[in-house]
Amino acid sequence: MKINRLNTIIILGLVAIIGILIAQLLWTRQAYTIEEKKFSQKVYVSLLEVAKKLYEGTNNELPSENPIQKVSNDYYIVNVNNDFDAEVLEFYLKSEFEKASIKTDFEYAMYNCQSDEMVYGNYISLDKSNNKTSVFFPKHKNLVYYFAVRFPNERSFLFSSLKFWFILSFALIIILLVYVYSIVTILQQKKY
């Protein structure tokens, strides 16, 4: 084989493998974005169901405006404009998150309009040995009866749902390294 032909094969092979690796990394990033949106939608639907259940059995109706505000990727506020019990809220949150397959730790707090502060915060962990007690939630203006939910492990939960993509990317990196090693070995032996 001539040197020019070998160089062409080496360059084409490297370009192809690097192109596949870049495409894989872009797909992994897009998969993360999609998982993040799916998680947000599941949380939104679950919190809306919790708000509806808190209104059941009362004389008040669920407001027509959206009661859920997404403050950040892992922090949601639900305005219910209705008095509710903390134990009932916790039960509804657990059951709705379980229905939606949201299997990550969360913490919540509810606003007490009498003391004008967030109270009764609780950390709900799927791992029973993990008991966090310090929960801080800021107070929000213009809301009277509301609760807040935070998912402290959202990012690790999303990464764990993308294990397949990371394994595939790692395998492609290994293939690239084997290819480079093979080319270096061929060039060192000068069998071309």
Features from the language model and the residues they span:
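Membrane-proximal low-complexity regions enriched in glycine and acidic/polar residues
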Residues: 40-112, 116-118
